[in-house]
Structures are given as C-alpha cells and as structure tokens.
Amino acid sequence: MFSGASAINLDAKGRIAMPKRHREPLHAHHNSQLVITVDIQSPCLLLYPVQEWQQIAVKLSQLSDTQPAERAIKRMLLGYAHECELDGNGRILLPTPLRQYANLEKRAMLVGQLNKFELWDEAAWQQQIEESRIAILNEDLAANQRLADFSL
C-alpha cells in the first residue's frame, strides 16, 4: 500500500527517481514493474504496479467499443499506457507524451494512493490540494452516505 506525498525532480532525460521508501516494496512485491497512464479526470499520471494494472485491464476489456464514452475511456487509458521497470538506481523514464499530458518539466509530486501513485506537476498539485480543501470545507459530508460515518 502506497501513501505519502514526495517532492521529486525530473532529470534532463525525463526520468524520475522513485523515493527509497517505495523501491523495496515495488521490487519485492511487484518485481519493479509499473504501468504508467493518464488520469482521465485530472492533469496527472497514474503509476500502477503491473499486477494492479492487470486488474484495470480486465475492467477495460469489458467496456464497449461501440459506446462513445466507454471507447473514449479505453482509448485514453490504453493509448497512453506504458510499461516500465525501475532501473538499478530506482528510476523510471517517463515517455514524452505522458510528460506533456501532465505538464511535467522539472518539479513534480509523487502521491501514494494505496494501490497506485499519482504523479503531478508540483504547481498543479498545490492548486489541486487547495481546491480539494475548499471543496471539503463547503461540502455537507453528512449528506454523502459514504462519508457520513467516515472519521479519523
């Protein structure tokens, strides 16, 4: 399970170094293999351990090629999907189309989301956090069945 937000940098070749605390679990449980794709609702990338991605792929295979919305989701997620493996230094190369989609240039945030990571441009992440904070403050959490009993 992945959690926490880490500030990271892209090098001149478009590589990121996975934070050390995530390298060993990725190596031990996922053979250092990831699939990177786009988030269809936010300007960020999603990094899935390959086994997690296989579950997503099964769900995608059940979507219709004749329904425009379903086909669009498949096209985005599968079209951008890129398999990669951490190198000996714990780095992964982000292909140019993926970097462009998320506007990744130099400074980024890698955010653990239990079964996957999100990779954000640092400024976009800060903006998203502020928007989320405001949305939570303005939301009637008791009206949301799934959040009504949620407590920390």
From Swiss-Prot:
The keyword Cytoplasm applies. It is found in: Cytoplasm, Nucleoid. The keyword Metal-binding does not apply. GO terms for molecular function: DNA-binding transcription factor activity; transcription cis-regulatory region binding. Belongs to the MraZ family. Keywords: Cytoplasm, DNA-binding, Repeat, Transcription, Transcription regulation. It comes from Shewanella piezotolerans (strain WP3 / JCM 13877). GO terms for cellular component: cytoplasm; nucleoid. Forms oligomers. Its main location: cytoplasm. GO terms for biological process: negative regulation of DNA-templated transcription initiation. This is Transcriptional regulator MraZ. It comes from the Bacteria. PANTHER family: TRANSCRIPTIONAL REGULATOR MRAZ. Residues 5-52, 81-124 form the SpoVT-AbrB domain.
